[in-house]
C-alpha cells in the first residue's frame, strides 16, 4: 500500500484534470436572509454615539491629567535645582566667611569702689566699660556700645565728642594728666577715667568744650588727634548740637545743571520734586536768583503784549545763560516742553513782582501809621 501511495503522489496529472481544477466553483444556494438581518449587522458594527462621547471625554481627561502631572514634575525639578544651588552658595559663604567670635553678654559685675575704668577694647566700634555710681555702691553698670548704638548716638545732642568723667570737676582737671586709660572711638566719642579716693564722692559729669582754643590745648596734653568740632548752642542750660558741619559740607558740593555750567548745591538739586515741571522750575529760579532780582527782571526783557498801551518801565533781562541751563535741566528731568518751562519762569517773575509791590504798600502804610502816632 505504501508503494501505491508513493506512486500516486509521484504520478503526473493529466491535462483534463488540471483544467477541471482551474475552473471556478459555482454554488447554487437558496437562503432566507432579510433586511432585518442587515440592520442587526449595522447596529453591531456602528458604535453608540453616547459611548463615543464618553470615550472622548475620558481621553480628554487623561490628557489633562498627564499635562498637570508633567507641570508638577517640572516644578519639582526646578525647586530641587534651586535648593541645591542655595545650599551650594550657603556652603561656599560659610567656607569663605571668617570665624565669628562668641557674643559677649551684658551682665553685672561686682567691683570694689576703688577700681579703675576697664581698659579699652580692641575693636574701635564696640566699647565695653563700667561706670561706678557711688563710692559705697559695689554694683557697677556695664554698658555696651555697639555699632548700632553709636549710629543712634551720633544724632543726639550729647553724642558728638562726649566726655564721661568720674570725680569732681575741679579734681578731674587736676588729675587729668595722671589718667592713663583714655581712648577715643572713631566717631569722636571718648572717655576719661581716673581713680578717686573713698572720701571724694563720684559724680557722672558730661562736659563739652565750646571753643576751638580749648580743643587746641587738649591736643598736646592728650596726644590725640580730634576732628574739628561744630558749634554748640546752649538753650535753657542744656547744650544742643546744631550739626551744621555736615550740611555745610553738602552745600559746598555744587552740581552743574546745563551746558553753560550753571551750578546749584547738590543738596538742593537732589531734593527737587521733578514730577511737577512748574515746581522744579520755581525751585531752580529761587536757588540761582534772589527774590529781588526775580521781581525786577523778566525772562526776555521785552514788554508784555498785554501792557503795550501802558507806560510801564521795562524790566531787565535775566541772565540768558542761566535761563538756558534751567530750561535744559527741567526739560530733561521732567520730560516737559520748553514752552512750559518758559511759562513757569514768566509766571514766577510776575508773582515775585506782585509780592514786592504788596510788601512796599505794607511798609508805606505802616510808616504812615507810625508818623500819625508820633504826631499825636
Swiss-Prot record:
Record's subunit section: Homodimer. Interacts (via BEN domain) with Su(H). Interacts with Cp190.
Recorded GO MF terms: chromatin insulator sequence binding; sequence-specific DNA binding; transcription corepressor activity
Disulfide-bonded cysteines: none
Coiled coil: 50-79
Native source organism of the sequence: Drosophila melanogaster
Function in brief: Can act as both a transcriptional repressor and corepressor. Represses the expression of genes involved in neural development and preferentially binds palindromic sequence 5'-CCAATTGG-3' to mediate transcriptional repression. Acts as a corepressor for suppressor of hairless (Su(H)) and inhibits Notch signaling during peripheral nervous system development.
Listed Gene3D superfamilies: BEN domain (1.10.10.2590)
Major site of localization recorded for this protein: nucleus
Lineage, uppermost ranks: Eukaryota, Metazoa, Ecdysozoa, Arthropoda, Hexapoda
Residue ranges of domain BEN in the record: 258-356
Any Pfam family the entry gives: BEN
UniProt entry keywords in alphabetical sequence: Coiled coil, DNA-binding, Nucleus, Repressor, Transcription, Transcription regulation
One BP annotation, GO: positive regulation of neuron differentiation
Record keyword Amino-acid biosynthesis present: no
Alphabetized InterPro entries for the sequence: BEN_domain, BEND6-like
Subcellular compartments: Nucleus
UniProt protein name: Protein insensitive
Comment on protein domains: The BEN domain mediates DNA-binding.
Record note on what altering residue 354 to A does: Significant loss of DNA-binding and transcriptional repressor activity. Complete loss of repressor activity
Cellular compartments per GO CC: nucleus
Amino acid at each position: 500500500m505504501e508503494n501505491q501511495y508513493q506512486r500516486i503522489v509521484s504520478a503526473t496529472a493529466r491535462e483534463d484534470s488540471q483544467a477541471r481544477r482551474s475552473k471556478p466553483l459555482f454554488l447554487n444556494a437558496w437562503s432566507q436572509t432579510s433586511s432585518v438581518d442587515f440592520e442587526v449587522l449595522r447596529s453591531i458594527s456602528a458604535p453608540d454615539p453616547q459611548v463615543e462621547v464618553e470615550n472622548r471625554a475620558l481621553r480628554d481627561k487623561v490628557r489633562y491629567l498627564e499635562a498637570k502631572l508633567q507641570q508638577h514634575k517640572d516644578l519639582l525639578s526646578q525647586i530641587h535645582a534651586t535648593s541645591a544651588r542655595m545650599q551650594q552658595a550657603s556652603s561656599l559663604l560659610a567656607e569663605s566667611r571668617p570665624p565669628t567670635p562668641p557674643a559677649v553678654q551684658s551682665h553685672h559685675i561686682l567691683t570694689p569702689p576703688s577700681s579703675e575704668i576697664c581698659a579699652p577694647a580692641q575693636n574701635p566700634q564696640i566699647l565695653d566699660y563700667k561706670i561706678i555710681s557711688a563710692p559705697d555702691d559695689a554694683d557697677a553698670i556695664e554698658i555696651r556700645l555697639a555699632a548700632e548704638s553709636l549710629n543712634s548716638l551720633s544724632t543726639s545732642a550729647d553724642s558728638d565728642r562726649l566726655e564721661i568723667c568720674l570725680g569732681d570737676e575741679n579734681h578731674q582737671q587736676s588729675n587729668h594728666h595722671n589718667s592713663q586709660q583714655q581712648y577715643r572711638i572713631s566717631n569722636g566719642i571718648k572717655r576719661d577715667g581716673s581713680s578717686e579716693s573713698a572720701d571724694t564722692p563720684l559724680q557722672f559729669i558730661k562736659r563739652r568744650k565750646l571753643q576751638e582754643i580749648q580743643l587746641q590745648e587738649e591736643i598736646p596734653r592728650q596726644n590725640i588727634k580730634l576732628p574739628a568740632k561744630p558749634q554748640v548752642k546752649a538753650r535753657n542750660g542744656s547744650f544742643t548740637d546744631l550739626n551744621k558741619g555736615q550740611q555745610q559740607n553738602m552745600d559746598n558740593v555744587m552740581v552743574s545743571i546745563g551746558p553753560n555750567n550753571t551750578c546749584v548745591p547738590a543738596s538742593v538739586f537732589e531734593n527737587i520734586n521733578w514730577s511737577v515741571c512748574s515746581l522744579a522750575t520755581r525751585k531752580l529760579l529761587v536757588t540761582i536768583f534772589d527774590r529781588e532780582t526775580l521781581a525786577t527782571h523778566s525772562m526776555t526783557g521785552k514788554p508784555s503784549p498785554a501792557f503795550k498801551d501802558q507806560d510801564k518801565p521795562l524790566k531787565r533781562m535775566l541772565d540768558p545763560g542761566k535761563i538756558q541751563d534751567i530750561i535744559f535741566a527741567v526739560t530733561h528731568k521732567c520730560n516737559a516742553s520748553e514752552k512750559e518751562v518758559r511759562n513757569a519762569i514768566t509766571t514766577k517773575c510776575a508773582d515775585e513782582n506782585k509780592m514786592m509791590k504788596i510788601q512796599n504798600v505794607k511798609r508805606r502804610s505802616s510808616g504812615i501809621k507810625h508818623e500819625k502816632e508820633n504826631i499825636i
